[in-house]
Curated annotation (Swiss-Prot):
The lineage of its organism: Bacteria, Pseudomonadati, Thermodesulfobacteriota, Syntrophobacteria, Syntrophobacterales. One of its GO terms (molecular function) is DNA binding. Belongs to the SfsA family. Signal peptide: none annotated. This is Sugar fermentation stimulation protein homolog. It comes from Syntrophobacter fumaroxidans (strain DSM 10017 / MPOB). It comes from the Bacteria. Residues 1-23 are annotated as: Disordered.
Length: 261
């Protein structure tokens, strides 16, 4: 039994600097860099929805998992995982699950990453879809939904929702990996914006390297898939991008084609 209130230091004798994942320097290929105090451990199980059990150097401890999806195909006991250390010394669980090793590559599971990558890519000017937008706002309310981003500038205005993708089936990156009522709501709002003549987009960050294209997971959430197709028909833009996830950090990779619509 592990102690969830006072997790043991998985690396005895090591004093953590408690630095959260950082924005990469302008010369770095990474948009997000993991600090030196991030560390690997062995995944043991998912105790609760937002809690994972891990082991390092013979010590059992718990870590926070902000991914509410099923993470289908990733939660294999014995797999290596990468954990970051919270800069908040009073947080009950100081460690956050960032990625899981699947075979020879890492899969990013932190659902806050797509929003950060979107903004950092805009800031560096490396996302073609956001060229001509010189103002960027995280989280903006539209109708009854709060969307992840809003950008405006000489090119106009664009509303954006960002999603994390970890599921790949037969070389196809698929979203979602579990039924998502919240995701359905966001897609409806994007569709309403597009039908009102506004530019709207959904940014899907595929945090693994083994997909050649992207499609909605109709075999998991047929309602979301139907809404996805209706959104595309209404003019909502789909931006699926591969993330290059390593032990050191995360970079923005190639854009994937959308299939099945």
């Amino acid at each position: 039994m592990t102690d969830s209130a006072k997790p043991q230091n998985p690396d005895p004798g090591h004093e953590s600097r408690r630095v959260a994942p950082l924005a990469g320097s302008p010369r770095s290929p990474f948009l997000i860099e993991f600090p030196e105090d991030s560390f690997t451990a062995v995944f043991l199980g998912r105790e609760k929805r937002f809690l994972v059990e891990a082991e390092r150097n013979g010590h059992l401890f718990q870590a926070h998992c902000n991914n509410s999806g099923s993470m289908l195909g990733l939660l294999r006991p014995g797999s290596d995982i990468l954990l970051s250390v919270s800069p908040n010394p009073s947080r009950r669980l100081p460690y956050t699950l960032e990625s899981i090793k699947l075979g020879s590559h890492w899969v990013g599971v932190n659902t806050l990453v797509p929003n950060r990558i979107l903004r950092l890519a805009w800031d560096r000017g490396i996302l073609p879809e956001l060229i001509g937008y010189d103002r960027f706002q995280n989280e903006k309310t539209s109708g009854e939904s709060r969307l992840d981003a809003f950008a405006e500038g000489p090119a106009g205005q664009v509303w954006i929702e960002a999603k994390n993708v970890t599921l790949v089936e037969d070389d196809v990156a698929c979203f979602p990996d579990a039924v998502t009522v919240r995701g359905q709501k966001h897609m409806r709002e994007l569709t309403a914006l597009a039908r009102a003549g506004r530019r709207a987009a959904c940014f899907f960050l595929v945090q693994r390297p083994d997909a050649s294209c992207f499609a909605p997971a109709d075999f998991i959430d047929p309602v979301y898939a139907e809404l996805f197709h209706a959104a595309v028909h209404a003019g909502v833009e789909i931006w699926p991008y591969e993330a290059v996830v390593t032990r050191q950090g995360i970079a923005l990779g190639r854009r994937l084609k959308v299939v099945g619509h």
